[in-house]
Amino acid sequence: MAEKRNIFLVGPMGAGKSTIGRQLAQQLNMEFYDSDQEIEKRTGADVGWVFDLEGEDGFRDREEKVINELTEKQGIVLATGGGSVKSRETRNRLSARGVVVYLETTIEKQLARTQRDKKRPLLQVEAPPREVLEALANERNPLYEEIADVTIRTDDQSAKVVANQIIHMLESN
């Protein structure tokens, strides 16, 4: 990859966007950003608290602003929040400003990877986690697919293996 194109990782919670994003950025010698971490940095509070205080709409407004700013940078890897694709503006920006990689995973893997994580506001509800994840998948998977330039399943692969697959796919395009 001669020129450093922005790489934007989208996908559901537990797909490995942050872990794979860090690995990918390291291998490509690019800057890594995580939209949730940027929101936390700017607000001084964790995303769960922001979500509780401002509701999902307030959180999504912050997320949209952060992603807009970050996608204006050059040569970055950005791990987006799982729900960021709900915003048409965000989808358009991601598509226009870089390569969008959809990290796909099964509900079973999502459950295994998120079961002890208390920083997932959408899972801190009364409904069974499987039902929540299935509903989110039904709503969001078509949006991930709509903007994806590349789709990679992450289920039983290490971050390094997935990062190498992404690099290979980008080099062959």
Curated annotation (Swiss-Prot):
Q: Does the keyword Calcium apply?
A: no
> Would I find Protein biosynthesis among this entry's keywords?
no
Molecular function terms in GO for this entry? ATP binding; magnesium ion binding; shikimate kinase activity
> Can you tell me which residues bind Mg(2+)?
18
**Pathway where this protein functions:** Metabolic intermediate biosynthesis; chorismate biosynthesis; chorismate from D-erythrose 4-phosphate and phosphoenolpyruvate: step 5/7
InterPro entries the record matches: P-loop_NTPase (IPR027417), Shikimate/glucono_kinase (IPR031322), Shikimate_kinase/TSH1 (IPR000623), Shikimate_kinase_CS (IPR023000)
User: Which terms in the GO cellular component ontology are assigned?
Assistant: cytosol
- Compartments, as annotated in UniProt: Cytoplasm
For the protein in the UniProt heading, the enzyme class is transferase
Essential cofactor(s): Mg(2+)
**Which range is the signal sequence, renumbered to this chain?**
none
Q: Which residues bind substrate?
A: 36, 60, 82, 140
Q: Which residues make up the binding site for ATP?
A: 14-19, 120, 157
Q: So what EC number does this one have?
A: 2.7.1.71
- What biological-process GO terms show up in the record? amino acid biosynthetic process; aromatic amino acid family biosynthetic process; chorismate biosynthetic process
The note on the cofactor says: Binds 1 Mg(2+) ion per subunit.
What's the catalysed reaction?
shikimate + ATP = 3-phosphoshikimate + ADP + H(+)
What residue intervals traverse the membrane? none
Keywords annotated in UniProt: Amino-acid biosynthesis, Aromatic amino acid biosynthesis, ATP-binding, Cytoplasm, Kinase, Magnesium, Metal-binding, Nucleotide-binding, Transferase
Its quaternary organisation is: Monomer.
Give the similarity note. Answer: Belongs to the shikimate kinase family.
- So what does this one do? Catalyzes the specific phosphorylation of the 3-hydroxyl group of shikimic acid using ATP as a cosubstrate.
- What is the protein's given name? Shikimate kinase 1
Q: Which gene encodes it?
A: aroK
